[in-house]
């Protein structure tokens, strides 16, 4: 009779993520993992795994510092940041360093300092990584029990979780301190076209902060991505920082409840899967944030959003034709709808033409021209400022829309600049990374659950191709 199930199911299987096998060395024979499996060889060597993590941090910080200095070296102050392929300097500018009114860069020295500090930090991390990978103790449990761990020790794992949460909370409060006391941050909504300012009136109301979480993610609602107020952003970081720190203290002081012990798989591979899942969510949220939000990601540095570029085109031609004598309030377009202005489904006065689909856009160069019922016709005739005209003309030709050969711009805009917007680049890269992190989460979660159930998913170790290959040494 043919067996319909794997006999392996009935034997306890210890994958090498479980941390119960007494292993030494870093080769195939002693770990079960070949050299190309990377850090999997170090699962039960806490000292060496620490070295790998510290060295990895060093590589990350080295890239940040080197790329930072590369962007500073190539930066042209006369051109907008978003036209120069910059992805790091916009973040520094958003934090208020080196910029003045209108987002104009007035000093590149803070950017240079940032790059140098990251390079110095990467050297320290690099030396630490090399030390722990090559010279330090293989395991930490004996000599440094505070830093040692066993993957199945639930209490130790939640203590480590708590420490991480506290560090995240401190990071959130660093932004709060920068905004409140150390020079402020760049506010794209500051009167006259944006400026650096200190945040003096934080939004701490839980109904406002947590109200964002209850919003619909669609249309004009936009969930947390719809935030358009720096007071709300910094106040949200106060809440997040407090929750992370209090949650961290909670996890350090307590042991997992019975339901948590039953619900979760407690192994190294399970923790890896949880981490990848969390990073995936972060990536998808960051993708939406950088694509749609022009407050946390000011258009002066990242370029306009797609809807913003489209609305800017309509506004630019309204300004032009109004000067040529057109009555923008009553002119009819080819479809019978208003050529320049029309009404939204809720009765607001909005721009006409194809940009009507973006009628709920909010942008600092446009909001001064709105009244209680949408765009105010009298303001459009009398109150348009030169900086609004200049900015909309610039945004009209720099839409974050591009094909594979980098030909970008609104489809109907013949003057579009051929470039890749950092907004496009950051949104796309975070979506792609978020997707692959999610796939990694599913893969490792499946393996971890299978191991907990008593069998191992993946390539049969007896049939691994590497076993038939010639050894490297």
From Swiss-Prot:
N-acetylthreonine is found on 15
Q: Which SUPFAM superfamilies match?
A: Photosystem II antenna protein-like (SSF161077)
Q: Subcellular location, in the record's words?
A: Plastid, Chloroplast thylakoid membrane
Q: How does it sit in the membrane?
A: Multi-pass membrane protein
A GO molecular function held by the record? metal ion binding
Q: Name one Pfam family in it.
A: PSII
Name one process (GO BP) from the record: photosynthetic electron transport in photosystem II
Manner of cofactor binding, per the entry note: Binds multiple chlorophylls and provides some of the ligands for the Ca-4Mn-5O cluster of the oxygen-evolving complex. It may also provide a ligand for a Cl- that is required for oxygen evolution. PSII binds additional chlorophylls, carotenoids and specific lipids.
* Sites bearing Phosphothreonine, chain numbering: 15
* GO cellular component terms given for this protein: chloroplast thylakoid membrane; photosystem II
Please give the HAMAP family that the UniProt record associates with this protein: PSII_PsbC_CP43
Q: Report the sequence similarity comment from the record.
A: Belongs to the PsbB/PsbC family. PsbC subfamily.
Name of the molecule in the record: Photosystem II CP43 reaction center protein
- Source organism per UniProt: Phalaenopsis aphrodite subsp. formosana
């Amino acid at each position: 009779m043919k067996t319909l199930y794997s006999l392996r199911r009935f034997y306890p299987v210890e994958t090498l993520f479980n941390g119960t096998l007494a292993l030494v060395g870093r080769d195939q024979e002693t770990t079960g993992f070949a050299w190309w499996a990377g850090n999997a060889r170090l699962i039960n060597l806490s000292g060496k795994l620490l070295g790998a993590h510290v060295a990895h941090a060093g590589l990350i910080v080295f890239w940040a510092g080197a790329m930072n200095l590369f962007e500073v070296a190539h930066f042209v102050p006369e051109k907008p940041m978003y036209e120069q392929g910059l992805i790091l300097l916009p973040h520094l500018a958003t934090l208020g360093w080196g910029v003045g009114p209108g987002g104009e860069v007035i000093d590149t020295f803070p950017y240079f300092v940032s790059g140098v500090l990251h390079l110095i930090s990467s050297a320290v991390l690099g030396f630490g990584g090399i030390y722990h990978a090559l010279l330090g103790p293989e395991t930490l449990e004996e000599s440094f029990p505070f830093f040692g761990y066993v993957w199945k020790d639930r209490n130790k794992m939640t203590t480590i979780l708590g420490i991480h949460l506290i560090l995240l909370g401190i990071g959130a409060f660093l932004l709060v301190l920068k905004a409140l006391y150390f020079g402020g941050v760049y506010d794209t909504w500051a009167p006259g076209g944006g400026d650096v300012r200190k945040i003096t009136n934080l939004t701490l109301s839980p109904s406002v902060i947590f109200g964002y979480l209850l919003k619909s993610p669609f249309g004009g609602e936009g969930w947390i991505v719809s935030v358009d107020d720096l007071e709300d952003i910094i106040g949200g970081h106060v809440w997040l920082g407090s929750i992370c720190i209090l949650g961290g203290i909670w996890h350090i002081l307590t042991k997992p409840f019975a339901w948590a012990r039953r619900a979760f798989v407690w192994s190294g591979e399970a923790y890896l899967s949880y981490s990848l899942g969390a990073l995936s969510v972060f990536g998808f949220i960051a993708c939406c944030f950088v694509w749609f939000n022009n407050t946390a990601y000011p258009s002066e540095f990242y370029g306009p959003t797609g809807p913003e570029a489209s609305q800017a085109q309509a506004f630019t031609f309204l300004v032009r034709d109004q000067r040529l004598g057109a009555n923008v309030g009553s002119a009819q377009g080819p479809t019978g709808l208003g050529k320049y202005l029309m009404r939204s489904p809720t009765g607001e006065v909005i721009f006409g033409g194809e940009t009507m689909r973006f009628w709920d856009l909010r942008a600092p160069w446009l909001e001064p021209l709105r009244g209680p019922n949408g765009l105010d016709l009298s303001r459009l005739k009398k109150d348009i400022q030169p900086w609004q005209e200049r900015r909309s003309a610039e945004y009209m030709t720099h839409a974050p829309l591009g094909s594979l050969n980098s030909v970008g711009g609104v489809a109907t805009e013949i003057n579009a600049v051929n470039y890749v917007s950092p907004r496009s680049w950051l949104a796309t890269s975070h979506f792609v990374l978020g997707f692959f992190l999610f796939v990694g989460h599913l893969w490792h979660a499946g393996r971890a659950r299978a191991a907990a159930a008593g069998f191992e998913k993946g390539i049969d170790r007896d049939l691994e191709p590497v076993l038939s290959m010639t050894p490297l040494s």
